[in-house]
A protein has these predicted regions:
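Extracytoplasmic gate region of multi-pass secondary transporters
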Residues: 32-37, 157, 231-299, 385-389
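C-terminal transmembrane helical hairpin of 12-TM major facilitator-type secondary transporters
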Residues: 246-255, 279-357
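Intracellular juxtamembrane helix-capping segments at the cytosolic ends
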Residues: 39, 120-134, 141-142, 349-362
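Symmetry-related core transmembrane helices of the 12-TM Major Facilitator Superfamily/SLC fold
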Residues: 175-195, 408-427
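Hydrophobic core of transmembrane alpha-helices in multi-pass small-molecule transporters
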Residues: 104-121, 335-349
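Helix-to-loop junctions at the C-terminal end of transmembrane segments
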Residues: 64-77, 294-307, 393
Length: 460
């Protein structure tokens, strides 16, 4: 199943909505923290255990993106979106069965494994297509689509909280909420499957598109078109520097995002104005809004100031934000909330900017497959971030600590990880020409046509 080629006159601005319909759906993953307290209560789980479906989903996201990236390039975005629809929706249906029967392993398998595969394939499905449609503004194009993944929880978080209030927070209410999620997302994601189009070869190879594709990245010198294969990219230090950059940025962001609802309640549990469950769900929605805004805002900014400079901002200022939370967050809700919002905007911006960073370094030839392989950094971060925050919080609670003290050590670790990412970003340099593929030769028919045209004046 391949996506139909766009007819003449097809507007490229119809493609981002197709990507958004998929990314807004799979972005529900960022609202998992809303389900954590009910699951812990209904199934007698610890905070570390209730994070397992989310952690495994992120692991499977990276693995399926890495191993499926080349197939997505070959089979096209419509095939990928269909696979994502089936897996993601089926994951919720299996989780509903697991909750109804009080079998936590089935929730882990359904949401974490099956749903995680849908996350990975769905996440990368529109990326290379968008870059081909928008060679002149790759940061903007991928930001428009990928912001949907960050904004998915903006819808899913209050929606899930409302369903749990209506259905109840016992295992049957959780099962009903999972069931509604699965059926609703199946319908919504089908819109993307029906709408997606790939650019016509003539349009992709037009002089304007070719010139835009060869345009240098902001701050870079003009040069020949870069073409690096996915296999060749793995042999470059640039790929692994970006792997570290993405892993550190995601670990720092996902740690706070996965535990956002219980974290803000713990931080201010002993204050004169504790945070209610509904207010905590609203905080998760705010974080999702910042995540979404960062994906479009910061990725568009990278088209102006350059990818390396914008990652300096993400990692350097991000480390400062974590430090402020550690030092002053427990004493001030505004400081805690503002710093968390800035961090999540950087977290989202990092995801949306990375495809354009890859395009600048490796070209568009196999950027989708390269992006898929890089997302193994997300898999690693999906384990590290929640594990660091949840395990240390459980350990501190067992030691008799409460409030902000539960998170001081883990958030300090996040500060250090962002510094490591900052150093890795500084090490990124242009890819050495020895890794470049030869420029494609013009088809014989085109060459013959050019020869014929050049000879016409002589025969006249």
């Amino acid at each position: 199943m391949s996506a139909p080629v766009a007819p003449p006159g097809w507007s490229r601005w119809l493609v981002p909505p197709a990507a958004l319909s998929v990314h807004l759906s799979i972005g529900q993953a960022y609202a998992w923290s809303v389900f954590k307290p009910p699951l812990e209560s209904a199934l007698d789980l610890s905070g570390t255990q209730s994070a397992l479906p989310f952690q495994l989903a992120i692991v499977m996201l990276g693995l399926s993106a890495a191993f499926g990236g080349t197939m997505v390039e070959r089979r096209g975005p419509r095939w990928a979106m269909t696979v994502a629809l089936v897996c993601f929706s089926s994951g919720f249906l299996l989780s509903a069965l697991g909750a109804a029967t009080q079998q936590f392993w089935l929730i882990v398998f359904g949401y974490g494994v099956v749903g995680g595969i849908g996350l990975g394939i769905g996440y990368i499905s529109p990326v290379s297509t968008l870059i081909k449609w928008f060679p002149d503004r790759p940061g903007l194009a991928t930001g428009i689509a990928i912001m949907g993944f960050g904004g998915g929880a903006l819808i899913a978080s209050p929606w899930s909280a409302r369903m749990l209030e209506s259905f109840g927070e016992d295992h049957t209410g959780i099962a009903a909420a999972f069931l509604v999620h699965g059926l609703t997302y199946a319908v919504f994601m089908s819109l993307g499957v029906l709408l997606i189009r790939v650019p016509r070869p003539a349009a992709a190879g037009s002089p304007a598109a070719t010139a835009a594709a060869k345009a240098p990245a902001p701050g870079a010198a003009p040069g020949p078109e870069i073409r690096v294969s996915a296999r060749g990219a793995l042999r470059t230090p640039q790929f692994w520097c970006l792997w570290v950059v993405l892993c550190m940025n995601v670990t720092a962001g996902i740690g706070i995002l996965e535990k956002a609802a219980p974290m803000i309640r713990d931080f201010f549990a002993g204050s004169s104005a504790p945070v209610s469950a509904s207010a905590a769900a609203g905080f998760v929605a705010l974080l999702s809004a910042a995540n979404m805004a960062g994906r479009i805002g910061w990725s568009s900014t990278s088209d102006l100031i350059g990818r390396k400079n914008v990652y300096r901002l993400y990692l350097g200022v991000g480390a400062l934000m974590y430090l402020l939370i550690v030092l002053f967050g427990g004493a001030s809700k505004p400081v805690f909330v503002v710093c968390a919002l800035v961090l999540l905007s950087f977290y989202g911006g990092g995801f949306a900017t990375i495809p354009a960073y890859l395009k600048d370094l490796f070209g568009t030839h196999q950027v989708g497959a390269i992006h898929g392989r890089l997302l193994t950094a997300w898999s690693t971060a999906g384990v590290l971030g929640p594990l660091i925050v949840n395990w240390l919080a459980d350990r501190e609670a067992a030691a008799g600590k409460d409030g902000p003290e539960l998170y001081v050590l883990s958030l300090s670790i996040m500060t250090g990880l962002l510094v490591v990412g900052f150093i890795a970003n500084e090490l990124v340099r242009p890819v050495h020409p020895r890794h470049h593929l030869p420029a494609p030769t013009a088809p014989k028919e085109a060459a013959h046509g050019a020869d014929t045209r050049s000879q016409q004046p002589e025969s006249a």
